[in-house]
Amino acid sequence: MRRKVKNTKRHQWRLTHSARSIKRANIMPSNPRGGRRF
């Protein structure tokens, strides 16, 4: 299950773990779990 998700969301994972992730976490500190996952 994780292999398929990694391959399907491979580009999104990079964007999520990018500088945008820090900005989103700062904007939504109340939802750190959702921001980190999405």
From Swiss-Prot:
Chain's role: Mediates ssDNA packaging into virion, it locates to the internal surface of the capsid, thereby displacing the internal scaffolding protein during virion formation. Additionally, protein ORF8 plays a role in viral attachment to the host cell.
Gene Ontology CC terms: host cell cytoplasm; viral capsid
Protein's UniProt name: DNA binding protein ORF8
Localization terms from the record: Virion; Host cytoplasm
Keywords: Capsid protein, DNA-binding, Host cytoplasm, Virion
Molecular-function GO terms, alphabetical: DNA binding
Major subcellular location class: virion
Recorded family membership: Belongs to the microviridae J protein family.
Cysteine pairs bridged by disulfides in the record: none
